[in-house]
Amino acid sequence: MSGRLVVDLQDVDAAGLAEVGGKGAHLGELSRIDGVRVPSGFCVTTHAFRRIMAEAPESGELLDRLSRVDEGDQEAVRSLAARLRQVVGATPLPDEVAAAVTGALARHGERSAYAVRSSATAEDLPTASFAGQQDTYLNVVGTEEILRHVSRCWASLFTERAVTYRGRQGVDHRTVHMGVVVQRMVVPRASGILFTADPVTGDRRTATVDAGFGLGEALVSGLVDPDVLTVRHGEVVARTIAAKRRALHAVQGGGTRETPIEERRQREPVLTDDQAVELVALGRRIEAHFGSPQDIEWCLDDDGFHIVQSRPITTLFPVPERDDDVFRVYLSVGHQQMMTDAMKPLGLSMWRLTALAPMYEAGGRLFVDATARLAVPGSRATLLDVVGRGDPLTRDALETVLENGEFEPTPAETDGGAPPAGDGAEPDEADPSIVTELIERSRRSLAELEREIGTKSGPALFAFLREAFEEHKRVVGDPLNIRAIMAGMEATWWLNDRLEEWLGEKNAADTLTLSAPDNVTSEMGLELLDVADVVRTHPEVVAFLEGVEDDGFLDELPKVPGGAEARDAFEAYLDRYGMRCVGEIDITXPPVRERPSALVPVVLDHVRAFGPGAAARRFEDGRRRALAKEREVLERLRDLPDGERRADAARRMIRQVRAFAGYREYPKYAIVSRSFVYRQALLREADELVRAGVLADREDVHYLTFDEFEEAVRVRRVDERLVRRRKDAFRSYQALTPPRVLTSEGVALSGAYRRDDVPEGALAGLAVSAGTVEGRARVVLDMAEADLEAGDILVTRFTDPSWSPLFVGIAGLVTEVGGLMTHGAVIAREYGLAAVVGVERATRLIRDGQRIRVHGTEGYIELLS
């Protein structure tokens, strides 16, 4: 195939992407499906495009410059793209290319009308459609016109929209080439688009048909409103008939013309129900062939339906793979862990290997199957209650699934499920000494892991790790560990419910848990204030840190007066917290021990914003406030009827919540501490593969599963194509927003607030830390780029424990993801910040620098400017 300038569509299949581009490869593959009619034609190959680019003056230099330009510099992008279009469009077609196209036209009918369609190699891919980025020309007649439009298609690879889109997708412009499809025109009476899955809800069982009169380009370009038909299980279940006032038609001799539609026909259905069902059946055949939901362009003439394009619907959130047809309901793990970014394959596989429950993978995220718990009334009520307290949006999404009738619960039966957490009963008291015991057990287990793993390498390391994962699960799943976590949560729920009922006091536990002991995440933030105390006593150290640009600064720091003491303070901090990082549930994310420069701006901010001893003062202030709140609450309770009994119950629960609330953060710390040890050992193996020439980059192992990594170490070989595919898939997954709830049929649900107490124009969320604060919003998407001042309100997508040092100086917190007991909420309460989480699209609806008011008790945000 190498070097061909023209190839007939019938000789192309999906493997021809590099030769004919995405559209051409898909059309060739479509033409091979039984019962699918694709207009005949040929492709001008990417070899012809390369010939043009080789002969086009300046093209190489312009492409190099375009690939280096910052995608945010739109003026530079616009200028370079325009120059490339001009250069390519002005380059004459080589004689061999013109002869090849002319010969193909002679075979297919040189007097016929054709569609001339761009087909880039970065187009209609499984992970990115690139739809509409290059040009298509309809009803082109005559050899000279077709040659001219082939040249125009080549130039359209460099339209500003195409260049911008590729830049955002991380595609190097120098690696993309253009094929051109030249295809016999179908002159249709109707045309449109078929989505074999609902593009809004994601439901794979529901197909949507958009249909209009005449050529489909009018519909694709938004010139006309289409009829919309919804087809499910072989029948039309909904239809909207639009007023179709205009249509696009082919003109005799070439070109197209927009024409008005007679008034009497404007409300006529474009398709009958039978035709819509027939079209969807055709779409299902195409979907089955390609193995994923498709966005299909179709047209209808007297001979029936013709398919002129099919591409993956890349905006749908993927569905976990399964081996049965049972309707299933999945809950997002990332929303519970406050990390909704896509994870790499190594991180996904290791989380699954160490998880207590089966995990299911989709879109680079993890989900748990909640079907069994929803099936039985008792466990269903408990799940909805517990989930609802932590994250009302997830509860609403689950209730939507139940209300839609998709899920068929089992009849009422005794299932041994616990009563809902809010049933009013006082929780059993737990022995506070178990916290000390659990922490000591965890430390001993970690020390043993560190001692033993150092002696392992090669295949023996992976065998050892599999045993370590079992110990990992034993530590995390220890019933005593679960009891300690639940003791704090149950006491929190009881106090909040009863004190609001008895005293009208909302979220009283927020204050009662201030400066609770054993909260390793709040200690992480406060201890960085202690590092700042060391740094501030040495002006030369401060000056040195202000110039830090890389992660090697700790080696240079002792050369500065006072630097040795400062280095020791940093090292002590890293010894305890260096395993933490943004997105720490993914073992491939670099911990702060490997990126210590991330601490420098936070330490310098603390030096400027706080005086010496701030950590101890803040902790003691929190403890005093908690004790004062306890005295106040108990005194008010004693004044009520049956007050002594109520006060005694509250005292017991306050004692319990203070004993156990801090421990809520420890299990995650223990998990990440173990994962850091795993990571160090695995990276040593990756480095060995690099030294052996098996890998080009140690981080390529991030795109292998644990099993694949083990195999690579054993056989000393890695499939580079697999790694490239995984990198492409990861980039596409990063662009997807994961739902809180996902069904096995692809319905993605994020939930909604059902409230009438939110002022008009305010943003609703979940109240997780009491108080009201007004200040400047700082919208931060990357912790490393945070520029916060005292009194600012942090607005971000999510926070995990690694963000804790930033909480020390801010006044409030707003996140898009989170729940009552997730880490950001716990630490916001610990630091006394007004906080609202679960605010949908907060980082887009709140402007950086905008003044806002956070109502942490009521759960909403007012936009003030």
UniProtKB/Swiss-Prot annotation:
Q: Where is this region: Disordered?
A: 403-430
The annotated region (Swivel phosphohistidine) lies at: 765-863
Effect of gene knockout:
Disruption mutant fails to inactivate RIF. Mutant displays a modest twofold decrease in RIF minimum inhibitory concentrations (MICs) compared with the wild-type strain.
Which GO terms fall under molecular function for this chain's record? ATP binding; kinase activity
Q: Which GO terms describe its biological process?
A: response to antibiotic
The stated induction of this gene product is: Up-regulated in the presence of RIF.
According to the UniProt entry, the note on domains is: Contains three domains: an N-terminal ATP-binding domain, a large central rifampicin (RIF)-binding domain and a small C-terminal swivel phosphohistidine domain that harbors the conserved histidine residue essential for phosphate transfer.
List the protein's name.
Answer: Rifampicin phosphotransferase
According to the entry, what is the taxonomic lineage of the organism?
Answer: Bacteria, Bacillati, Actinomycetota, Actinomycetes, Kitasatosporales
